[in-house]
Amino acid sequence: MKILIWHVHGSWTTAFVQGRHEYLLPVTPGRDGDGLGRARTWDWPASAREVTPAQLREEEQPDVVVLQRRRDLELCREWLGREPGRDLPAVFLEHNAPGLEPGDGPVPHTRHPIADRDDIPIAHVTHFNELFYDNGRAPTTVIEHGIVDPGERWTGELARAAVVTNEPVRRGRTVGADLLPGLAAAAPLDVFGMGLTGLHEQYGLDPARVTLFDDPPQHAMHAELARRRLYVHPVRWTSLGLSLLEAMHLGMPVVALATTEVVEAVPAEAGVVSTRPERLWAAVREFLHDEDAARLAGKAARAAALERYGLNRFLRDWDALLEEVTR
């Protein structure tokens, strides 16, 4: 089938477009939020095609739309002249934990933006999110993440910790940016992601202790992550980070805050999960000094990630949902 989906979350979409369908990715002249088109830093197959609004109106009518934002509803009406859920089958893919968008309201009373509709199912990416949103009348399901397996590549040759985070200066405490000084005191630290400019200054980080890798291509980031001794996930409040699951696939041991879905994703043998930063920093130091323990934890992390977050299961789950809504 032809699936209309906007390029909103590159890592998630990388897994989604590995399926057997045609994926129509809107592109606008400015490649803005209404139409980013194909990814520049991820490898997507030819079945993921860029389409203009005019093409969508005239020749590329989709069979189903995967909505990810309120704005997508408006664009379907404007570009296609069709109403999602009524004359265009639709699923609303909710990437976020509640309370992160303007107007969301306080958790756990955050009402989902389509909570008053019963004609569009909400697909949450974690059971935590499904539980904490007020979904109202909307039917819900959970399709957990799937990862394109980068392979078991961990060497741990560099006695350093790795963190992947996007826009930590803007997002601050939400992604645990304020915890980085404590982490950097426990281990030399490499931070990968987008929007890292100003991170040293904002949190008083020593450039000799903390190195930034701003927006590397995914394949290059995986290669660099695998050389670090361990992966640290200091995030307070987001959905389950795909970078965490990718690190587990690489075979990296994990040290993570026990928040949102992390406690379900990271088994005890894969590393250390706690709400106590001092316990996490102690675990970081232990892995730096015990490479064998890091290797064993990394193997357990990879096994757990493959079992629960494999690509084939993810694609099967999405096929089943899309077939249901297009019946």
What are these regions (language model features)?
Residues 71-169:
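Catalytic core of nucleotide-activated saccharide and alditol-phosphate transferases
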Residues 132-136, 148-205:
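Conserved catalytic-core segment of nucleotide-activated headgroup transferases in glycan assembly
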Residues 198-219:
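Nucleotide-activated donor-binding/catalytic signature segment of Leloir-type glycosyltransferases, i.e.
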Residues 222, 245-249, 260-264:
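Short alpha-helical segment that forms part of, or immediately flanks, the ligand-binding pocket
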Residues 236:
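Aromatic "clamp/platform" in nucleotide-sugar-dependent glycosyltransferases that forms part
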Residues 253-256:
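Short hydrophobic beta-strand element within catalytic cores of glycosyltransferases
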Residues 268-278, 286-292:
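Conserved acidic donor-binding segment of nucleotide-sugar-dependent glycosyltransferases
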Residues 289-323, 327:
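A charged, aromatic-enriched C-terminal amphipathic alpha-helix characteristic of glycosyltransferases
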